[in-house]
């Protein structure tokens, strides 16, 4: 179902057309549905992209790469979502994994577009119709889902993070090579351990040679996530399957375009800028015709926080986490803190920020820290429910 042209209709007729469009979308069944099965379309994680809906999608979410997300790099027109990567020099706070610290005013050179669902889920069938970006190599159009990182889970075998890549396009040396991978953090021998596709190919990697150039036209990419299996599809054909060992956490559905080689280098389990800062091939855009999410009735039951919607009863907070333990700023600089309240289904996620030394650094109710004078200050975030806290140190040079 795509946009409906509405010209010179009276208001009641327009309303009927829109209601018909909504009804048509809701009644659709996924292509993998078998006779007798009932699947329900999840409206909060589905979109035909007739409008840019900021109530459904976050278009400027947290940064985690060597590019920065910008709201204006995500546009909707003619029934398509367009995510654009641009060559734009800028600075922001950057996590330096090799030195395990936040670095203020880190120089970066590219911006891009993202649409991250505000709603979360897990088990179900996910499908998007995507056309890749024209530039190759350099960017990777992606359709994926990922959870928060829950550092409070410390028992052996606990899964702190889950990520399912429905597809990542054009990030390898050959344009037709696609990745359909899994990532996770699991507690092993008492320590949180990243499991990446390169190090754990048996459980985490699926590679596929596409029978087409993904830059030239729209194709469908899908995944079916159940308690036991994860199965990937391209244009309705199965292209990979893995046992679902670790991917049971609530995840946000995401469409994005990331930067890749030759503009990036991978080290210390993250991307860093490379020496190549060329503007050639930029701006470049991926397009999304639609994204749809279904849950099968009667076969997707699970505990809250592991794939189903939150319960109607009150859910208490058990922890709050800041994205870093220490951050360095110069006098006059500011940064916005990112706090995660867990569990995801917690009813009251409101927090209060405070500073131990307002002469050094202040923090407002939105988590914006401003460096005042040289020294150190401890910033505390505290949940209104249960009073859970986390802290970070602000050092002002």
UniProtKB/Swiss-Prot annotation:
GO CC terms in record: periplasmic space
Molecular function (Gene Ontology), one example: kappa-carrageenase activity
Enzyme nomenclature, EC number: 3.2.1.83
Residues covered by the BIG2 domain: 316-387
Catalysed reaction equations from the record: Endohydrolysis of (1->4)-beta-D-linkages between D-galactose 4-sulfate and 3,6-anhydro-D-galactose in kappa-carrageenans
Annotated site (Important for substrate recognition): 260
Disulfide bond positions: 98-268
Biological processes, Gene Ontology terms: carbohydrate metabolic process
Keywords for the protein's UniProt record, in alphabetical order: Disulfide bond, Glycosidase, Hydrolase, Periplasm, Signal
UniProt KW Signal keyword: yes
Cellular localisation: Periplasm
Presence of keyword Lyase: no
Source organism, top-level taxon: Bacteria
Domain GH16: from-to ranges: 26-299
Cross-referenced Gene3D superfamilies: 2.60.120.200, 2.60.40.1080
Residues annotated as catalytic: 163, 165, 168
Signal peptide: 1-25
Family that this chain belongs to: Belongs to the glycosyl hydrolase 16 family.
Protein name: Kappa-carrageenase
Gene: cgkA
């Amino acid at each position: 179902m795509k946009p409906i042209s509405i010209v010179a209709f009276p208001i009641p007729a327009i309303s009927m057309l829109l209601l018909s469009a909504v009804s048509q979308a809701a009644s659709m069944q996924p292509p993998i549905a078998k006779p007798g099965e009932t699947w329900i379309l999840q409206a909060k994680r589905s979109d035909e992209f007739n409008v840019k809906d900021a109530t459904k999608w976050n278009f400027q979410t947290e940064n985690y790469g060597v590019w920065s997300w910008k709201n204006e790099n995500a546009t909707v027109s003619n029934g398509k979502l367009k995510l654009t990567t641009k060559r734009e020099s800028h600075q922001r706070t950057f996590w330096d994994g090799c030195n395990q610290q936040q670095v203020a005013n880190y120089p970066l050179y590219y911006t891009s577009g993202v649409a991250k669902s505000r709603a979360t889920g897990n088990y179900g069938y996910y499908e998007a119709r995507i056309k890749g970006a024209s530039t190759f190599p350099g960017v990777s159009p992606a359709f994926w889902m990922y959870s928060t990182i829950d550092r409070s889970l410390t028992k052996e075998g606990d899964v702190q993070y889950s990520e399912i890549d429905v597809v990542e396009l054009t990030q390898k040396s050959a344009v037709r090579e696609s990745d359909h991978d899994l990532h996770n953090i699991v507690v092993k021998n008492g320590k949180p351990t990243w499991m990446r596709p390169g190090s754990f190919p048996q459980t985490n990697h699926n590679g596929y040679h596409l029978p087409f150039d993904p830059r030239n036209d729209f194709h469908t990419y899908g995944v079916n996530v159940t308690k036991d299996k994860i199965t990937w599809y391209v244009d309705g054909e199965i292209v990979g399957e893995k046992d679902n060992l670790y991917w049971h956490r609530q995840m946000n559905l995401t469409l994005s375009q990331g930067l890749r080689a030759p503009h990036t280098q991978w080290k210390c389990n993250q991307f860093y800028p490379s020496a190549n800062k060329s503007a050639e091939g930029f701006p470049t855009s991926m397009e999304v015709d639609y994204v749809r999410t279904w849950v099968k009735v009667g076969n997707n039951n699970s505990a809250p926080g592991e794939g189903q919607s939150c319960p109607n009863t009150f859910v208490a907070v058990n922890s709050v986490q800041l994205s870093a333990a220490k951050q360095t700023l110069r006098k006059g600089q500011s940064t916005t803190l990112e706090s995660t309240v867990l569990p995801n289904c917690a009813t009251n996620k409101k927090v209060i920020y405070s500073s131990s030394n307002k002469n050094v650094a202040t923090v407002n109710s939105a988590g914006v820290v401003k460096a005042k004078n040289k020294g150190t200050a401890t910033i505390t975030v505290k949940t209104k429910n249960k009073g859970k806290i986390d802290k970070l140190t602000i050092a002002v040079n």
